[in-house]
Amino acid sequence: RIVRINGDGSIRLILDDVAKDSSGNSIKTAFNTNKDDNAYVGYMYGTPGSTTYDTTHENKNDSTIKIAVDRWYEDNLKTNYANYLSDTLFCGDKTLAESGIGSNNTSTGYGVNITYYSSIERLIYSTGTTDITTSTPTLKCAEKVNDNYSRYTTTKSTLPDGKETNGNLKYPIGLLTADEVAYAGAYKYNQTNKSFYIYNNNITIFWWTLAPISFSGANALILRVNNSSADLYYNYVNTSYAFRPTVNLKYNVKFTGTGISADPYKIVTE
C-alpha cells in the first residue's frame, strides 16, 4: 500500500498485511530480546552499559526485529525486486526529548538513566506526563542533531539539509515511523480511528513502528500500533509483535494498473 511520496521522488510502500512465513503464519518478534538498557530502543544499537550517548547509540549491532525484517526481505524481495527499490532513509529517531518531558527525565540516553526520546513529545506528552492535545508529527528525521545514528540507509549519503545518513542497513527495507502512522490517521492510546489510511481489518495483532519512546530505568519502550483499536501506544521492546515491512520504489519504476482494488498497480519487471 502506498504511504507517501518521499522527498527524493521515491514511493514509500507498506505491506498491506503483517509479514508472514512460508506457511502463512504471522511472524512475531521482539523489537529487542533485551530491554534493560537505553541501547535497546534502537533498530541498531551500540554497547549496552556504556557511559556516553554515542557509544550507546552508534549502530554496531542489529536489533532482533531488524534481523527478522532482513530475513523477510531475503525470502520475498531480494531475488526479483531489489533493482526496483530506492535507498531512501528510514528514521528510527533516537534523539532526546526536551528535559521537561516525562517524569524524572535525565536526558542522557545511556545506561539505565531514565530517558525520553523525541517521538514522545511529538505524539504523546506536551509537558511532563500531560497528554498532548494536538500531535505534531514530522517527516524530517532527527533534524536537531548532526549524528547519523537515527538516519538509516544502505549507503552513506548527504541529505539536502546537509545531514548525513549512516549507511548501516544491509538491505533497503525497514519499518514506518510512528510519525508516518500518525499522518496516516492513527490516534494515540484510547482514541480509536479504524478509518485511518493503513488500517487493515484483517490484522488482529499489534505491530511495531521504528519509534523509540523511552527508557524507564528498567525497560526500553517502542511505539507500536494496536490494530484492533487503531491506536498508537508503547510497550516493552522484548514483547513479541508482528511487523509490516516497508520499502521505497524508485521514482522511475514502470507499472500497470489503475490503483483500485480490482486493478492494483503492478511493477513491470524486465
Where are these regions (language model features)?
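Long, domain-scale functional regions
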Residues: 1-270
